[in-house]
């Protein structure tokens, strides 16, 4: 933990960030504007990168032939042909 210019000491206790005031009391700290802006930028960038990859993976997955479905389809078609021949 370091002290930056214009930024009070910041202590991280578990998931709650607190800042130490001049009188020694700790108060809950709101996230610094720059870190909030940076996180928003990071999330936006990750969404732009991750979403197209997810779409590509889904398209690949959907384009793959599912062996079980192919097996069932051929089995049903064979039975249908046999059944229709007997009638």
Swiss-Prot record:
The record marks 66 as: Low pathogenicity. Signal peptide: none annotated. One of its GO terms (biological process) is symbiont-mediated perturbation of host apoptosis. Its main location: host cell. Residues 65-87 are annotated as: Mitochondrial targeting sequence. Keywords: Apoptosis, Host cytoplasm, Host membrane, Host mitochondrion, Host mitochondrion inner membrane, Host nucleus, Host-virus interaction, Inhibition of host innate immune response by virus, Inhibition of host MAVS by virus, Inhibition of host RLR pathway by virus, Membrane, Modulation of host cell apoptosis by virus, Viral immunoevasion. It is found in: Host mitochondrion inner membrane; Host nucleus; Host cytoplasm, Host cytosol. Coiled coil: none annotated. Residues 19-34 have a biased composition (Basic and acidic residues). Is not encoded in all strains, and seems to be dispensable for replication. Oligomer. Interacts with human SLC25A6/ANT3 and VDAC1. Interacts with host MAVS. Plays an important role in promoting lung pathology in both primary viral infection and secondary bacterial infection. Promotes alteration of mitochondrial morphology, dissipation of mitochondrial membrane potential, and cell death. Alternatively, inhibits the production of interferon in the infected cell at the level of host mitochondrial antiviral signaling MAVS. Its level of expression differs greatly depending on which cell type is infected, in a manner that is independent of the levels of expression of other viral proteins. Monocytic cells are more affected than epithelial cells. This is Protein PB1-F2. The lineage of its organism: Viruses, Riboviria, Orthornavirae, Negarnaviricota, Polyploviricotina. The gene is PB1.
């Amino acid at each position: 933990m370091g002290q930056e210019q214009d930024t009070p000491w910041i202590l991280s206790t578990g998931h709650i960030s607190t800042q130490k005031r001049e009188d020694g009391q700790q108060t809950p700290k709101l996230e610094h504007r720059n870190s909030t802006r940076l996180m928003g930028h990071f999330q936006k960038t990750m969404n732009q990168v991750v979403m197209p990859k997810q779409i590509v993976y889904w398209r690949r997955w959907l384009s793959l032939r599912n062996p079980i479905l192919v097996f069932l389809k051929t089995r049903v078609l064979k039975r249908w042909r046999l059944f229709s021949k007997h009638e």
